[in-house]
Amino acid sequence: MNNVLQFGLQSSAIYVAKFLVVPLRSLRVGSSFVGVGVGTRSFNKRLMSNATAFSINNSKRKELKIPGAAIDQNCHQMGSDTDRDEMGTLQDDRKEIEAMTVQELRSTLRKLGVPVKGRKQELISTLRLHMDSNLPDQKETSSSTRSDSVTIKRKISNREEPTEDECTNSEAYDIEHGEKRVKQSTEKNLKAKVSAKAIAKEQKSLMRTGKQQIQSKEETSSTISSELLKTEEIISSPSQSEPWTVLAHKKPQKDWKAYNPKTMRPPPLPEGTKCVKVMTWNVNGLRGLLKFESFSALQLAQRENFDILCLQETKLQVKDVEEIKKTLIDGYDHSFWSCSVSKLGYSGTAIISRIKPLSVRYGTGLSGHDTEGRIVTAEFDSFYLINTYVPNSGDGLKRLSYRIEEWDRTLSNHIKELEKSKPVVLTGDLNCAHEEIDIFNPAGNKRSAGFTIEERQSFGANLLDKGFVDTFRKQHPGVVGYTYWGYRHGGRKTNKGWRLDYFLVSQSIAANVHDSYILPDINGSDHCPIGLILKL
């Protein structure tokens, strides 16, 4: 054996020491191959084609066919007892495997029918496991004299061989059935029950390599399944083009569903119905939006046909307003701009309308609250429209006390004063996700600006408890719909967002709201526009 290794079509016996995996760079690629190792490392590895016929003496060889490992019946042959010592020497030499690249390891494992997921060290461990599991131990050696060959086969219920993923998910060696069918090859047909626990224990011990202990396929599959069951986060199959249709929430209730404007908006009002259509949008810098290649103000106006557009965070200076007015779309001839004078290029609000308002007011009329350009109020025939950009509590919640103790109360008083004469529509970026349904990760943002318990309680006390109705939540009580996705973590692609933008209306006109909706497909800002159709 050490001197000569012959391959041919004769009926003479061939003792194949072991199916030895070698680096792909030292092999010629063929449809299938058998690597043969002998005692001396200088002996060349040879490739054999599937077309070559092997005649092997059944009385002097053993086949061990492992489910999930055999690709071709002509491959993966075990050697005779006399070759096992030589094979042990080769198995101890791991340098060739260590030198293989990830691509070579994966290619080799695929040829063996072994799953190839994982990093390089995991692939090396898997390959070693396959080699080790094919070496008969002392008990197998002593028992080999009593039986010519033993074949362990997977139970197959009248179907083809499963794919690699199926093998992993259904516990590759079918241990869950509690026994394995053992069939004697060629001469004798013996059935022996193999203890599933013993096999699992043996596999686990074989997989210990150095400081790492690789769990068996059965244990890995079980662990993955249990972890998937434990996770509280639900993100359904995402749509690349419409990620907002994905229910994305860390702790969703069983009756919640994702907002889909294509299926959740009511039919249009009958022609001739008197109504007004208002849109609002935090543009996060108007100049930047107008330069955004995929944005067209004209196309947006044509598509939505809104009557009034409210903008927040325009970040314009007073000197920029006249230039911007020249770029407005024809028909929207009435625009009103409030800019920050205390901090340039900051905050700012605007109302752009094709309906001429009866009057316009900037700010709240109280000193100390009107220097950042956060409020524009327009009076129309049947309602007041307030466009506001509520102050963010900031990093470290530095402005939290100012917001809840001063700003929120001032805004509430301003609204209630106007409501004495007409119903009020309050819109804009209110910088508060009021309930857990309004934010992807409520538990992780309890001390984040916009979701603190103080801000949420103030939102309720100063607005909702004063008789104002959250129109979107009234129309969609169990729907997860976001209007803001941070740039930092790419939340828009996975629909991990917040609902910060609102239309709140006086209780007296809440029944006149035909539709309160979100337009998540509109890009150009970290917020998206929202709309309101109000019957007059």
Curated annotation (Swiss-Prot):
It is found in: Plastid, Chloroplast stroma, Chloroplast nucleoid. The active site is at residues 389, 527. Expressed in the siliques, flowers, and stems. A high level expression is seen in the leaves. Expressed in both vegetative and reproductive organs. It comes from the Eukaryota. Keywords: Chloroplast, DNA damage, DNA repair, Hydrolase, Magnesium, Metal-binding, Plastid. Residues 1-278 are annotated as: Highly charged. It catalyses: Exonucleolytic cleavage in the 3'- to 5'-direction to yield nucleoside 5'-phosphates. The record marks 501 as: Important for catalytic activity. One of its GO terms (biological process) is DNA repair. Residues 129-168, 203-225 are annotated as: Disordered. Its cofactor is Mg(2+); Mn(2+). Coiled coil: none annotated. GO terms for cellular component: chloroplast nucleoid. Residues 279-536 are annotated as: AP endonuclease. Its EC number is 3.1.11.2. The record marks 431 as: Transition state stabilizer. The keyword Hydrolase applies. InterPro entries: AP_endonuc_1, AP_endonuclease_F1_BS, AP_endonuclease_F1_CS, Endo/exonu/phosph_ase_sf, Endo/exonuclease/phosphatase, SAP_dom, SAP_dom_sf. One of its GO terms (molecular function) is DNA binding. The record marks 527 as: Interaction with DNA substrate. Its main location: plastid. Disruption phenotype: No visible phenotype. Loss of chloroplastic glycosylase-lyase/endonuclease activity. Hypersensitivity to 5-fluorouracil. Ape1l arp double mutants have no visible phenotype. Ape2 arp double mutants have no visible phenotype. Residues 97-131 form the SAP domain. Belongs to the DNA repair enzymes AP/ExoA family. Repairs oxidative DNA damages, also seems to act as a redox factor. Is multifunctional and may be involved both in DNA repair and in the regulation of transcription. Exhibits apurinic/apyrimidinic (AP) endonuclease activity. Catalyzes the conversion of 3'-phosphor-alpha,beta-unsaturated aldehyde (3'-PUA) to 3'-OH. May be involved in base excision repair in chloroplasts. According to a report, has a significant in vitro 3'-phosphatase activity. According to another report, has no in vitro 3'-phosphatase activity. Has a strong non-specific affinity to DNA. This is DNA-(apurinic or apyrimidinic site) endonuclease, chloroplastic. The gene is ARP.
